[in-house]
Amino acid sequence: MATKKKSSAANKGDDRQKALDAAMAMIEKDFGKGAVMRLGDDDRPPIQAISSGNTAIDIALGVGGFPRGRIVEIYGPESSGKTTVALHAIASAQKTGGIAAFIDAEHALDPEYARLLGVDTDNLLVSQPDTGEQALEIADMLVRSGAIDIIVIDSVAALTPKAEIEGEMGDSHVGLQARLMSQALRKMTGALYNSGTTAIFINQLREKIGVMFGSPETTTGGKALKFYASVRCDIRRIQTLKDGQDAIGNRTKLKVVKNKVSPPFKIAEFDIMYGEGISRESSIIDLGVEHGFIKKSGSWFTYEGDQLGQGKEKARNFLKDNPDLADEIEKKIFVKLGVGAAAAEAGEDVAMDVPGADDPLTDEAVDLVPNVDFDDD
């Protein structure tokens, strides 16, 4: 009786599998190969990223940069460094042969400043749209082309609906921008994933009226962007850097408040120097000291016995003049923290260096095994 029940269950399982295979075959015929698949059969590589151009930010993001095929939101107060971070990401993408686009809804992009940050302005695609609908339609068309690696929309607050532009001053247009963003993000999300394009939305802060508890700060454009964004970064200026009485830059803090590709709430602190952008070398020194690769004795910084300089500014200039050394220290930091491509390469090297891991058992090796007679008492 038990055998009969087992046989019946097995037959039922076979029938279900055949029905599933038939359904999957029909789905693939109608919607294309890969429309439905088992997760274990997905041969896509791990999450790829576009480096932010700064070691501290790449580590805080957890995957070595801004994830490809995802939406990223960067928000903060005025002059906190939002556009600077986005332009550095564009420069980083261009250095690896990528194509970048910048939707300048604020009509405030400074080409000379972008050039100072390392952006190839001759090959940067720029659009200065008249309306929010036009801006998002252009962005969607560029993404669907499949040729764009990174696109920046600066900013969400400046995406003004057409009805508002054509209307009179003082007219009420409640929820127009929120509906516009919600519709655009619904359309763009799938296209971004399929094309591997990173979309960075820069956003501004507003204050909610009458909030008694919690933070009154909120971002513009409704709630859709908060849901669709895989990464949200809150950026703040925390200190003014001075050389004597002259201000030469800002100490800036970036907090990853939402992260779908790595643990969230990590914080990166870095220096933004006026006329230069984010100082990569300064972050390498900070992280190098923190993780023991760079020794600090008094005001002197040393690396493997070699002096980098007295004072952080001289050490920073030394690393700037010796980019190979800066790359070496940065790679060691990434490997130790298990972040980015450097860590993945190090893992592969360790696996390949295991002695005898791939050696076949040859006849000579077999002959070296002594004969053991288990019948001897």
Swiss-Prot record:
Keywords: ATP-binding, Cytoplasm, DNA damage, DNA recombination, DNA repair, DNA-binding, Nucleotide-binding, SOS response. ATP binds at G76, P77, E78, S79, S80, G81, K82, T83. It comes from the Bacteria. SMART domains: AAA. PROSITE patterns: RECA_1, RECA_2, RECA_3. Belongs to the RecA family. This is Protein RecA. It comes from Corynebacterium aurimucosum (strain ATCC 700975 / DSM 44827 / CIP 107346 / CN-1).
